Amino acid sequence: MKKAGLLFLVMIVIAVVAAGIGYWKLTGEESDTLRKIVLEECLPNQQQNQNPSPCAEVKPNAGYVVLKDLNGPLQYLLMPTYRINGTESPLLTDPSTPNFFWLAWQARDFMSKKYGQPVPDRAVSLAINSRTGRTQNHFHIHISCIRPDVRKQLDNNLANISSRWLPLPGGLRGHEYLARRVTESELVQRSPFMMLAEEVPEAREHMGRYGLAMVRQSDNSFVLLATQRNLLTLNRASAEEIQDHQCEILR
C-alpha cells in the first residue's frame, strides 16, 4: 500500500510540474508569435498593399487569416484577425462570432494547392488544443493530415458514433475522447464550440480545459472529438495529437 501511495504521489508531482511547464511556456514572449504575425504583418500588409504575406490568405471582413505553418509540408493555421486567446474565450460561444471550424474546413484547399493534387477529405483533420495543451496565446486551428492509426480507429467506430456526445470506445492516443456525429448542414449553422458548451455537462464553465478536433467520415458526415485536460493521466488536452504533420497517410 505504501508503494502504491508513493507512486500516486509521484504521478501528482509529475502532473503539476507538467502543468507548470505549460504555463511557463504560455507566459513568455514566444507565446505571442502568432498574434504578432497576424496583427502586425498579415493584416496591415493586406489592408495597405492588398498582399496577405506572410499569410496565405487574409479576410478582414470575415475575420480570419490562413497561415502556412513551418511544421510539416501541408499544415496550415486558421486564426482570427482580432484577439482571441483560445478555447477558454467566451467569444467562441457567442453566436455572432465566426464559425471558425467551418471556415477552417473550407481552407483545407490550401493543402491541395501546396501538395499539387487533391488531398482526399478523409486525410484531412482540424484540431485546436486546450489552454494547457498549446504553446501560443492566439487562437489557431491546425489544418493538417490525420494520423493513419487514428483514421483507421475512427473508421472502425463509424457505427458507434451518434449525434450525441458519447465516449469514443478505446479513446485516442491513450487519452479519453468524446465523439459526436454532425452533418454538414448542422456544422454550417452551428459552431462546434457551441455544441460542446451547450451539450456536455459543465463544459461551458470549463471550455479552456478542452481540446477539440474534427474529421470527415466515409458517409460524408463529420465527427467532432473533444478531450478534457486530466493531469492525473498526463492528458493536457492537445487534440493536435490526432494529426500527422508529415502526412504519412498520403504516401
Curated annotation (Swiss-Prot):
As for family, the record states:
Belongs to the Cdh family.
Task: Please tell me the species this chain comes from.
Answer: Escherichia coli (strain K12)
Query: Transmembrane stretches, by residue range?
Result: 4-24
Enzyme Commission number(s) from the entry? 3.6.1.26
This enzyme catalyses: a CDP-1,2-diacyl-sn-glycerol + H2O = a 1,2-diacyl-sn-glycero-3-phosphate + CMP + 2 H(+)
Q: Does the keyword Glycoprotein apply?
A: no
GO BP annotation list: CDP-diacylglycerol catabolic process; phospholipid biosynthetic process
Reading the lineage from the top rank, the first entry is Bacteria
Which Pfam families does this one have? CDH
Q: Which InterPro entries match?
A: CDP-diacylglyc_Pase (IPR003763), CDP-diacylglyc_Pase_proteobac (IPR015993), HIT-like_sf (IPR036265)
Topology in the lipid bilayer: Single-pass membrane protein
Q: Which UniProt keywords apply?
A: Cell inner membrane, Cell membrane, Hydrolase, Lipid biosynthesis, Lipid metabolism, Membrane, Phospholipid biosynthesis, Phospholipid metabolism, Transmembrane, Transmembrane helix
GO molecular function per UniProt: CDP-diacylglycerol diphosphatase activity
| Any one GO CC term of the record | plasma membrane
Question: Under what name is this protein listed?
Answer: CDP-diacylglycerol pyrophosphatase
Localisation per UniProt entry: Cell inner membrane
Q: What NCBIfam families does the entry give?
A: cdh, PRK05471.1-5, PRK05471.1-6
Pathway membership, UniProt: Phospholipid metabolism; CDP-diacylglycerol degradation; phosphatidate from CDP-diacylglycerol: step 1/1
